[in-house]
Amino acid sequence: MGQRIPVTLGNIAPLSLRPFQPGRIALVCEGGGQRGIFTAGVLDEFMRAQFNPFDLYLGTSAGAQNLSAFICNQPGYARKVIMRYTTKREFFDPLRFVRGGNLIDLDWLVEATASQMPLQMDTAARLFDSGKSFYMCACRQDDYAPNYFLPTKQNWLDVIRASSAIPGFYRSGVSLEGINYLDGGISDAIPVKEAARQGAKTLVVIRTVPSQMYYTPQWFKRMERWLGDSSLQPLVNLVQHHETSYRDIQQFIEKPPGKLRIFEIYPPKPLHSIALGSRVPALREDYKLGRLCGRYFLATVGKLLTEKAPLTRHLVPAVTPESIVIPPAPVANDTLVAEVSDAPQANDPTFNNEDLA
């Protein structure tokens, strides 16, 4: 059986880790709507420390959106999208939904962010040219099968919409190559199995709920309140499918197969924010919590993923040189020196001003 290492504030398990051979490393991000603000905080800490040892990236819904910003090396981008755009009435409007429209307007969100703060896809293209891969998960509307898309400049924004199209709330779904897709969280909210299938030996998983927490999705609870029982009937099979797949994924994380190693970064308690309709103060608190958890991960696990452990144990004493120079490890508190986009509208420079005390 593999190994699961929980990483959250107050958990000392990462402190006892010894050097190991990580092999192929994957970064996997869970969806969760506005709860993705926690993931944004974690990934902003990674970017601040220039920490990116990953070979493979997989995300669903909000996780795919967060990873898009990370892969394009745009610190503060995801935070800005969640706090300044998803809180606007143009995006989330219950009255529009009652009148027969969409509860969430993904088209407005994608078009507004693309025009006002575009993703730096050229940066991502260079990453892909180096051999790294990024997959976004969306669910087929006809049979609920999860599909994993490699984004390109041409389809990137459409795949984000497909991966985030919450059933019922974005009524039409998203058509890709003639097939309708819905939110990838229906079938694969945390694509850890796909990461393992693609050869990853070490998984870093960022959750948006406390570990081992089984829950009914927030969007379904809201739908229960806003719609009558008769209107919910067509979605019963979909919800049951989601709950079954989510439990299966959770069990996979708790008991990884073979020699798989899973580092699970998660909030120590339920977040203040919810999937939709969160208040800005709640989002701000959860972002800070994500930053702190990201910093804790870097201080405990990060160096083990960037340093190569010896393949064999030497039987003869190693010769120690007269002087040893040890470069300082990347520290999350250091000033950001990574090259980022020079387009001010594409980043959020205020992300670095958060009070983390």
Segments (PLM) and residue ranges:
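Gly/Ala-rich beta-loop-alpha elbow adjacent to hydrolase catalytic centers
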Residues: 59, 63
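Patatin-like phospholipase
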Residues: 1-58, 68-357
